[in-house]
Structure formats: C-alpha cells, structure tokens
C-alpha cells in the first residue's frame, strides 16, 4: 500500500454501542494496527433529532472497555465532531454552487410528498424531478423570488450526472457499479437548517482527514455512488471502499434485529452482565472474518498480527449467542481466580452473598460461568431453600440402592471432625461408601449429588459438600431420606 493507511470509525451519538458498530470499529482498528496505520474516531452528530445526551461518551467508554484504542479523536483533536465543522462544509457548498454543480431547491416537503405519491400510484420509481425543468431564466428568477417572499428556506441539491457510471473495486465485494440515473435524481447536500447531509459531510471529512480506506457495513453500499459523485464534483480522489456483510441471527437467518430478545446486542449489556472484554473482542473479531484453520481463541495481539482484509467474508456473519457464551466460558475458565472474583464481587454483594466463602464459591463455579452475574444463580444452593426436584431427578432418587448410599455417607460425614471436614478428606469418605456398599458409578455419585445440591450436574462434589458445610449437607441428606 503506497499511501499512508488512515481509517476511521465515525459513529452517530444516537445511543448505545451496538455489536454491528463495534465490529466496524474493531475491523478498522485491526486494519490500521496490522498495517502500521492510523485509526481515528470522528463523531457524526449532524442529525440533531436523533442526538442522545451522553451518546458520545457511551460510545468511547464502551470501545475502551473492549480494548480498542485510537490515535485521533475529539478528545485530542479539534473539529472531530461534525457539528464543529459547519463552516468547513459551507465552504464546499458555496464552491459547488458557484461552479454550477449544485443549486438551491425551494420545493417544499409537502410538494415532494405529493409528487412521490403520484409516482407510486403511477407505478413509477420515486425520484426527485428538477423543479426548474423547462423554465426560462426569467421564470426561474421569478420562481425563486416568489418562494423566498413566502419565507421558504431552500435546501441545496447536487446536480447529478445521470449518464455517469459510478463504480469501485470493493475490498470485500469486488467490482460494484451504479448508473447515475438510478439513484433518485438530484439529491440534497445541505438541509434547510444549514446542516450538511450525511453523504456530503462524510466526503468532506474523509478527504480532509486523509482517510485512505473506508471499511463499513454493506448497508452503506447504496450511499457510495452518491459519495463518489461528490468526490467527482470536487475533483478529489476517492478512498478505497470495503463493505462488510450483514450480521444475521444464527437461529432465524434474518438480519439481526433489536427485537431478537435471545441475543445480547449492545456492548453495555455485556459489561453489565460481567462478561470479560477479551472474550467479547474475540467473538466480534470472528463475525465476518477468520484467519483460516480451526482455532477460535485469539488474543488482541494475535488478531492484529493475523488480520487480513482479503479474508473478510462475502457471506453474512451469523451471530450465535450460544457461541458467544461458550467463548466467554473459555476465557473465564482460563482466567486467574482474582480476576473473576473481582468481576463477580458486585453481583455477590448486591445479592447479599459476599461471605467469607465467596471467593471459594467463585472458584468452585468458575468453570461453569459464561458471565459473572451467573454466580448468583449458581450459588442459590448455599443461600436459598432446597430446590424442587425435576421428574428425572425424582426417578434417580427412586432407585432401590439410594437409601443405602445416603445412609452410609451420612454416617461418614457425622463421624468427621470440623478439622477433618476439608475437600481433600471428603472424597475418600465417598470412596469408602463405594467400598463398603459395592455401589459405584452413577448409582453412587448421582444420588449423593441430588441429595446434597438438588441438581444432577454441578462442580466437584467434595467441594460442593465442603462449601455447603457439614451440618447443612447432613441436613439435606436427612431430608432426602425422609422424602424417599
């Protein structure tokens, strides 16, 4: 690559950081870091109606949590918010007006809506038809004077070359081409309030900030020909474009929607539930890209080293919440206890469970956790009433050898001193029950687990019995024997 690599993530501060936008930021970050380039953040806040208070801070805070850093942003550079660049946009609007490449349009929203309705009723493709079409210069002057006298504030429209062909070699999709006559006619580059439209402002910003590559979602493909028109009108060289495929719900096969309640789609959700940021980074990094091979767990440094824009997928990326949770569990299992305990602490504290055994409980359930908030549900056994058994569990407990096993273990636990009551000493007692009764395997361990914990599966049995405590374990076994 000959020119310096400069890429950007340019969010609108209209709400929380969505997984799709996080992927856009991440892939731009990886592209820049892999090629030794510059990654910048620009805030596109020209849509004042959708502006959310604190939206910018939320975006940056969540990116930082993910482990994404940047070289330039509104925090360190002036005029990196579009709302601070209105004078810059005006300069280029005026230039295009002076060169006859743009013009003021006085058609009202009501007139546009009526024309669109007429076109749809006639089976025509909706498009703007130049309001000055067929007017002489005198008629045009009179029309403008009449509109201005009526207090109508004009927009500014780019004069589209309808015979033009607008094409680019997309980094992801390959050759893409649009005809100038198929984009809906002359389009607005400056709104009535003086703010630029997205497709105009983004070109000015990208050019002046020397952006070399624009990598974004393929919902922007239809914007690209309009942006190429602005580059052409201003005589500027366009950057390279790459449009990543949509993210779809793996269960429905449809575009990821906020209505998909079975998925966590905002980075804030993962923070709130106590996921490890490294796991979320890893998962997002594989949504529409992979380095080849079977490996799925990569560090940030490995992602940077391996990232290759030529391996961005042409097929939609499937968002699978179960896969995310599996990956998160892998990270939690392999993390040190202190890290996970600190992650779980707020949830234990809120539930009133930050006892002297809290760290040991986290250690016990760490292999089962996908997020730190799960520690509360996992430890219900130690703080709540004994759960109601399922039909399958009741069937196990109806076995003819169950009373023999439970009575034998109860005697062993009663005989243990407080000093002896440690995980390392509890397992030999279970083995002694096996030796004395001749009962082994599932017929031995399953009744004990269900009697003690009320569940068929869980962490290591000796640790569960130890953390439950000798008296409570005996009480649970006793209650189970009475219910048989």
UniProtKB/Swiss-Prot annotation:
Any Pfam family the entry gives: Anticodon_2
UniProt keyword annotations, A-Z: Aminoacyl-tRNA synthetase, ATP-binding, Cytoplasm, Ligase, Nucleotide-binding, Protein biosynthesis
Matches recorded under Gene3D superfamilies: 1.10.10.350, HUPs
Residues bound to ATP: 258
Subcellular location: Cytoplasm
Residue window of motif 'HIGH' region: 11-21
Catalytic activity: tRNA(Glu) + L-glutamate + ATP = L-glutamyl-tRNA(Glu) + AMP + diphosphate
One Gene Ontology MF term: glutamate-tRNA ligase activity
A GO cellular-component term linked to this record: cytosol
GO terms under biological process: glutamyl-tRNA aminoacylation
Coiled-coil region list: none
Top-rank taxon: Bacteria
Enzyme class: ligase
Catalytic activity, EC: 6.1.1.17
Motif ('KMSKS' region): 255-259
UniProt record similarity statement: Belongs to the class-I aminoacyl-tRNA synthetase family. Glutamate--tRNA ligase type 1 subfamily.
HAMAP family for this protein: Glu_tRNA_synth_type1 (MF_00022)
Subunit structure as annotated in this protein's UniProt entry: Monomer.
Chain's role: Catalyzes the attachment of glutamate to tRNA(Glu) in a two-step reaction: glutamate is first activated by ATP to form Glu-AMP and then transferred to the acceptor end of tRNA(Glu).
Name of the molecule in the record: Glutamate--tRNA ligase
């Amino acid at each position: 690559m000959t020119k310096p690599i400069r890429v950007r993530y340019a969010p609108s501060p209209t709400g929380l950081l969505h997984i799709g936008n996080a992927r856009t930021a991440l892939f731009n970050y990886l592209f820049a870091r892999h090629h030794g380039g510059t990654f910048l953040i620009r805030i596109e806040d020209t849509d004042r109606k959708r502006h959310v208070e604190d939206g910018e801070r939320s975006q940056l805070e969540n990116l930082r949590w993910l482990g994404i850093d940047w070289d330039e942003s509104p925090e360190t550079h002036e005029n990196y918010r579009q709302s601070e660049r209105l004078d810059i946009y005006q300069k280029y609007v005026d230039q295009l007006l002076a060169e006859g490449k743009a013009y003021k349009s006085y058609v009202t929203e009501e007139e546009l809506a009526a024309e669109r309705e007429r076109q749809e009723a006639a089976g025509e493709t909706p498009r703007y038809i130049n309001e000055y079409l067929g007017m002489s210069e005198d008629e045009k002057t009179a029309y403008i004077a009449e509109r201005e006298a009526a207090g109508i504030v004009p927009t500014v429209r780019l004069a589209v070359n309808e015979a033009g062909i607008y094409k680019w070699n997309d980094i992801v999709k390959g050759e893409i081409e649009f005809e100038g006559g198929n984009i809906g006619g002359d389009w607005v580059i400056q709104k009535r309030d003086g703010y630029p439209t997205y497709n105009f402002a983004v070109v000015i910003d990208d050019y002046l900030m020397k952006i070399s590559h624009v990598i974004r979602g393929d919902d922007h493909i239809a914007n690209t020909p309009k942006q190429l028109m602005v580059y052409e009108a201003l005589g500027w060289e366009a950057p390279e474009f790459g449009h990543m495929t949509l993210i779809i719900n793996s269960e429905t096969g449809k575009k990821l929607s906020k209505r998909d309640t079975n998925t966590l789609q905002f980075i804030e959700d993962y923070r709130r539930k106590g996921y490890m940021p490294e796991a979320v980074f890893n998962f997002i990094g594989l949504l529409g890209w992979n380095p080849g091979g079977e490996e799925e767990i990569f560090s940030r440094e490995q992602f940077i080293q391996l990232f290759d824009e030529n391996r961005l997928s042409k097929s939609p990326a499937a968002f699978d919440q179960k896969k995310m949770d599996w990956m998160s569990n892998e990270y939690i299992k392999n993390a040190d206890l202190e890290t996970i305990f600190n992650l779980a602490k707020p949830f234990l504290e809120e539930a009133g469970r930050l006892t002297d055994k809290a760290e040991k409980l986290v250690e016990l359930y760490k292999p089962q956790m996908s997020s730190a908030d799960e520690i509360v549900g996992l430890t219900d056994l130690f703080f709540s009433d004994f759960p109601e058994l399922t039909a399958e569990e009741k069937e196990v407990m109806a076995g003819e050898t169950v009373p023999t096993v439970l009575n034998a273990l109860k005697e062993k636990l009663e005989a243990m001193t407080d000093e002896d009551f440690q995980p390392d000493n509890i397992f030999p007692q279970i083995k002694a029950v096996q030796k004395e009764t001749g009962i082994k395997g599932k017929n031995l361990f399953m009744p004990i687990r269900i009697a003690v914990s009320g569940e068929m599966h869980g962490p290591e049995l000796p640790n569960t019995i130890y953390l439950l405590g000798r008296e409570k374990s005996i009480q649970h076994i006793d209650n189970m024997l009475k219910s048989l």
